[in-house]
Amino acid sequence: MAVIESVYARQILDSRGNPTVEVVLDTDDGAQGLGLVPSGASTGEAEAWERRDGDKSVYQGKGVLNAVKAVNEEIAPKVIGMDASDQRALDETMIELDGTPNKGRLGANAILGVSLAALYASAESADQPLYRYIGGTNGHILPVPNMNIMNGGAHADFATDIQEYMISPYGFNTYSEALQAGVEVYHTLKNVLKKQGLNTGLGDEGGFAPKMKSNKDSLNYIMDAISAAGYEPGKQIGISLDVASSEFYNKETGKYHFEGDDREAGYMLDFYENLINEYPIVSIEDPFQEEGWDDWAAITAKLGDRLQFVGDDLLVTNPARLAKGIKLGAANSLLVKLNQIGTVTETLDAIELATKNGFTSMVSHRSGETPDTTISDLAVAKNTGQIKTGAPARGERIAKYNRLLEIEEELGSTAQYAGYSAFKACKKYIAE
């Protein structure tokens, strides 16, 4: 038992220079945990509430001093004296204290900071690395890194409609080999773009963000880069997309403003089908808007045996929305973001529910990140087999990739790379 002795929050900056919450939690046995809270750019409407101050004269309204105050003045007195290692009891206490369905009083950024800090303090108290503390001895699978090497959408001033173009290096024996391949493709892509006279400035997540004439142009350049780097598209490296379609969906018209025109859901489904016939795409995230349950069910039924459809804005790491998706057959993969739901406990519950019902899980960063590496340990602890944490650039992204290298080394001969098996719905490339 590690009794919480003190909890203190402060305002710090994330990778985009926006304020976020840091929580320091100390226990009676000398352990200390640090909780650093990420923040998204394209967010689902059903996500837990991120508390911002709204004072336009300070950080353009994005300050989090009220969330900090909530930790120091409301949450801290309530949790001091509790067992930090009883994560469920701690998280439920904060949820009850908040008293709203979406953490809309205290703020998910306040609650998550404490939840994460308690998790780290408990792991230190138990003298265990975080992945071992969460997953026990069963956590041993290193995830496929889905690397966002070209940015569009809300991450890059809408250089393209599609928000993320990722490479998924699954055709390798170890995580370190896969990471090397991904990095080499990333650097090769820079040269490919330069030769075309295109800008190689970076988006929020470290990917290149040139203006493109079409979404397919980005895919073609990535295919060229994979081959030029000496790898086989499909066989060794697949492509994953985050369409983030809620960002260009018009609620009033019920249409998607895509490639310069307003499109019906049926057009979008046909577009995706043609895309996966033309390119080695193994995963599509948010192909439809966050309340388009019927459209999600239709694409999953039609194409779900060929690739994974990942629910981000649709499911928001929320066990209740995930249960609805399972019931309707909408999506077959869960994107896991700790700050979407706001506690460690609810995040773990969502992963377990997904696994139990045959969904894959992809543990994810946010576009506004910190040096925190929780998601790396979480992916290994729960054997999710997939992680997405941006391009192999920018320190806050590299920290996650480096943490996985450390874990792989620590696990030694027991480490297993998820590889192609991570994408359960995809069969055609490995069979060829």
UniProtKB/Swiss-Prot annotation:
Q: What is its EC number?
A: 4.2.1.11
Alphabetically list the UniProt keywords. Cytoplasm, Glycolysis, Lyase, Magnesium, Metal-binding, Secreted
By its UniProt entry, which SMART domains does this protein fall under? Enolase_C (SM01192), Enolase_N (SM01193)
How is the cofactor bound, in the record's words?
Binds a second Mg(2+) ion via substrate during catalysis.
Reactions this protein catalyses? (2R)-2-phosphoglycerate = phosphoenolpyruvate + H2O
> Which residues does the annotation say bind (2R)-2-phosphoglycerate?
Q163, K337, R366, S367, K388
Enzyme's top EC category: lyase
Q: Which Pfam families match?
A: Enolase_C (PF00113), Enolase_N (PF03952)
User: Belongs to which family?
Assistant: Belongs to the enolase family.
The protein's name: Enolase
